[in-house]
């Protein structure tokens, strides 16, 4: 059984080799290394650093279901379910009803997971100060690169905490939840954001676009700059964010994957579209026993496939989302399968089983439509899913840059609309022309370019038809993100950050007294709740309030 310790690694290999022949971060098993040993050689320092990278993976030996399914739980719930395009039954259905409470296990585990990583980073950074420059092959430059990666990891986890919970306790170098169990929340969100920016800016300054030693899976300049830009966007400093994103676009190594449908595929690791991912590799053993040798595994298929065909708790997709695509937008066929359609990777027909034929299924009447981003084979074959968790793609960089252009240049920004056009050209298949699909790809590539409807004209009419009141560019970005990032890691956060959450829900999922069919007879989401702006942040976990003497119920986020 693996142990979890600040100076210990818990996996046999975090990243291995891909078809391009590039190297990946390789993490071997090591025994506990005490600080007095850790900082006697560069190899030992890197072993300690690799222990920080371990915090991005699930904890297969954890006592909590959420620890074992990290990167699916709680991520899908936090970043998707409240927007209602993705829906859940069972214990997670409360997110679809906007009825979550502070004692929800997901909040507790998310908080603990993040602070476990931050505590490791703080201890590592405090000890790194004492390391002699002479032990590093590149001298001070080498030491700075180690510090940059550790600070970026800490900055990432504080970003994760801030976007979910707002103001949080800011533990600094040397502080952990063991030696600093009671610390109040930051005085302001700006204090939290500025700390994150400091960490990520330092990382961007000292790291390159290509990961250190060519080990894909390590923090890069592009990853640090992308999350730094997002933090500036939360601060409404779109000028600073825009400059960072423009630098990434002009100088970074990133490109859009020509076919949208080839992103979420077995063995697609660190393509040029990937800015930050957690790679789940195609190990020789992906059977039930795989969790005895690595944490680098997840149940992507089992946790998203239709229950009709072996899924444990399907990732249901709303009827509204399924109807929301323009003709020709291939993201629809690449992302979901609906009632009456054939799952393209398994040949299974949705709704072919007696009792599962309806628009809604199960005791909670969930929509009979499903995401296929992680459902690329029959449930159980293999048990674990060798598809990466793409936390940040280049497509997000482009759309974030578009948002900053509109915010700083106005609604007619040609640069902003050009980024949206690029995303839509890929969505309609124009980047597929002249290329061959990967092996066993169940869709045909476009053979000639087609004319994509002008985004500004389309969304001008869409805005009127749906009843939006925000600027056309805001509506365009919202719906493009909706279609681009279904069941990924950003949509609800983007809605909240851009102040579009209420408007999106009112226009796409209006309250309807719990009806399952609209006035046109189409199946729809039964929405009864009223929008509460307090729900744009999640609650400080009940356990934290009970155990942290510096935080009381009076410090809880409003509305909880």
Language model features by range: what are they?
Residues 21-91, 168, 193, 201-202, ...:
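An aromatic- and glycine-enriched ligand-binding surface/loop that stacks and positions planar moieties
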Residues 46, 50, 54-62, 85-165, ...:
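Conserved, well-structured interaction surfaces
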Residues 342-425:
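C-terminal substrate/ligand-recognition segments
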Residues 1-29:
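Bacterial Sec-dependent N-terminal signal peptides
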Residues 19-24, 65, 70-73, 86, ...:
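Long, intrinsically disordered, low-complexity segments
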